[in-house]
């Protein structure tokens, strides 16, 4: 039975190395996903701010285009 221990130890060591390798890849993937999420959040915040400004500008344009007729100067007389 003592002769089987080195083989068993080698199998356990190989399994441990495989698990450590997988863990390393998982940690790398998690870091990459965290960075991608942070970038997406920044992009979303920038887009929300841009939309807010565009809606403000659109409101100003609408106010100008659809002002009350009372506020308009009279048409020229020919």
Curated annotation (Swiss-Prot):
Pfam families: SlyX (PF04102). The gene is slyX. Disulfide bonds: none annotated. Belongs to the SlyX family. Transmembrane segments: none annotated. This is Protein SlyX homolog. It comes from the Bacteria. NCBIfam families: PRK00846.1.
